[in-house]
Amino acid sequence: MARCRTLVAAALALLLPPALAWYKPAAGPHHYSVGRASGLLSSFHRFPSTRRSESPALRVGTGPLRNLEMRPSVRSLALCVKDVTPNLQSCQRQLNSRGTFQCKADVFLSLHETDCQST
């Protein structure tokens, strides 16, 4: 059951659209980010020797996925999305975002590298 939840969480993360490049870090190793994005961008400027070691299990998400743990073996797992079939009858309009809907979908994944290369 936990493996199924992990795969569903990974599939949902893969379905999110890529973020727009709104920030270009300044050249040079001594640049420090300030403001809203400083926490997000701080890892770009760290040297490998100063990085914290990874924890054995990383808690992911809030809401229904808040108890989901991703172990290091699952985080490095290569998977590809074979097919996504949205259930249009389950779509609900998001109140805080204009023109955005949240829908349930059937997501078909593959853990085999050969399946990922054939698409």
Swiss-Prot record:
Propeptide: 53-119
Keyword Ribosomal protein belongs to the record: no
Localization: Secreted
MF terms in GO: G protein-coupled receptor binding
Keywords in alphabetical order: Cleavage on pair of basic residues, Neuropeptide, Secreted, Signal
One cellular component term from this protein's GO annotations in UniProt: extracellular space
Tissue expression profile of the protein: Detected in brain; more specifically in paraventricular hypothalamic nucleus, hippocampus and several nuclei in midbrain and brainstem.
GO biological process per UniProt: adenylate cyclase-inhibiting G protein-coupled receptor signaling pathway; neuropeptide signaling pathway
InterPro entries attached to this UniProt entry: Neuropept_B_pre, Neuropept_BW_pre
Protein family membership: Belongs to the neuropeptide B/W family.
Function: Has an effect in food intake, on locomotor activity and has an analgesic effect, (in vivo pharmacological studies). May be involved in the regulation of neuroendocrine system, memory and learning.
Name of the molecule in the record: Neuropeptide B
Encoding gene per record: Npb
